[in-house]
């Protein structure tokens, strides 16, 4: 944009509201935000469909749906009522089933288990007796380490090792619940509409490129970190539900 548009990035350490990003963008406190659509299920259950579904689409299928199968139009219909322009914001690829302090051997082992897991997966596990909670990313390690929760699902090898979960939870389960997880850019609709047309196009193209880049990087880093788990963390036991 030759300096016409600058984007300042604030982490949750500054705004202190990891689960309030939609509200902040809607209110104009931030012109733009980045998160995951399924966090807003308490406001509108339809938002969950734009992130992932258990046994649902993988990333290439999601992008085909968004751009050529009517997904963008459905997302616009849901977010128009919030005054927000929503756009695909990057994909983690298939996610792991979570880190557990104790091994899961039977369905009874889920009863009373305190676990951080969002979206449709949380709804499913709650039916099995799991006490589902949603904790901001910056608090996950401490919560698991102190036993505030018994298990958590975050992303996968691409990001989990950076969080250090392999140091405190010996059981790492493969996933079923998020075959691909699409994140979300949100732009205050009034602010977006006020931009000159060329800046609207630049921002849209930049978001699309960032989404593809995140997907490629996540896919690569998951493979690299998976190999690291086997070599550097022999204490971690890979399990399948």
At which residue positions do the language-model features occur?
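N-terminal secretory/targeting leader peptides
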Residues: 1-62, 72-241
């Amino acid at each position: 944009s030759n300096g016409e548009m600058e984007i300042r990035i604030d982490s949750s350490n500054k705004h202190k509201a990891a689960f309030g990003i939609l509200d902040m963008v809607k209110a104009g406190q931030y012109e733009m935000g980045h998160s995951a659509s399924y966090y807003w299920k308490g406001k509108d259950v339809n938002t969950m469909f734009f992130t992932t579904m258990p046994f649902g689409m993988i990333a290439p299928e999601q992008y085909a749906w968004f751009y050529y199968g009517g997904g963008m139009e459905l997302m616009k219909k849901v977010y128009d009522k919030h005054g927000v322009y929503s756009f695909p914001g990057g994909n983690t690829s298939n996610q792991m089933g979570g880190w557990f302090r104790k091994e899961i051997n039977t369905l009874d082992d889920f009863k009373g288990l305190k676990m951080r897991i969002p979206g449709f997966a949380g709804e499913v596990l709650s039916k099995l007796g799991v006490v589902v909670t949603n904790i901001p990313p910056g608090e996950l390690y401490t919560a698991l380490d102190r036993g505030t929760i018994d298990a958590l699902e975050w992303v996968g090898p691409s990001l989990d090792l950076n969080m250090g979960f392999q140091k405190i939870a010996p059981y790492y389960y493969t996933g079923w619940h998020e075959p691909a997880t699409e994140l979300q850019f949100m732009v205050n609709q009034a602010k977006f509409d006020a931009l000159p047309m060329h800046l609207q196009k630049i921002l849209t193209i930049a978001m699309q490129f960032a989404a593809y880049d995140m997907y490629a990087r996540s896919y690569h880093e998951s493979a690299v970190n998976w190999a690291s788990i086997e070599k550097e963390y022999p204490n971690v036991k890979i399990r399948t539900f």
